[in-house]
Amino acid sequence: MDQVMPIPNAVMKLLDLLPENATPYLVGGCVRDWLLGIAIKDFDIEVFNISMDKLIRILSKHGRTDTVGRSFGVIKWTPCKGETYDIAIPRKETKTGDGHQGFDIETDPQLDPRIAASRRDYTINSIMYDLRKHAIIDAFGGQSDLENRRLKHTSDAFSEDPLRVMRGVQFAARFGMCGDPATLELCRSIRNQFNQLPPERLWNEWYKWASQSRFPSKGLQFLAD
């Protein structure tokens, strides 16, 4: 595969807007889908070495910003007559309570990219793409897991959020993947915590399984395992 990712002009424009020391990465599903040869729906961006206030000031001069997600380190940026992009500052998460929302979130612009990637649920979602260098950053072997259709947790922090089990169900079904034995063991250890999750969050993952899966039985097998 050509390792230069096709990127919208509006996203590349960030390189001209941001200070030279600020490093923007594409993160999450867009990198995963590109590597799988799947059409990319959303480009999510994480910018290191810049404060949230400065990022908002810069982007507000070149489009509309929505700061409703600021407490989570995320803003939405809509360039003039363009699509909307989620742009985040790196963050650290500390488990403080039950369920999907029981976390204390602290943004840290100077966070090491490897540490930032470690909070992702599965290795296939931890792969980053450096927009300045046009280089893949794969600290946790996500590319190998994609090639081998292996669904593997990124770190032991996986067990802090039971929703990640159901995300695994729909990922397995969409991409034809099997659970890594250690990951399945972690899933079994938190399966009794589903009652901590809002029903709509569980439904959302089931909906993705039903509406987007090419291999629905793979998802059910992941859940059974």
What residues fall within each predicted segment?
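Catalytic cores of the polymerase beta-like nucleotidyltransferase superfamily
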Residues: 1-225
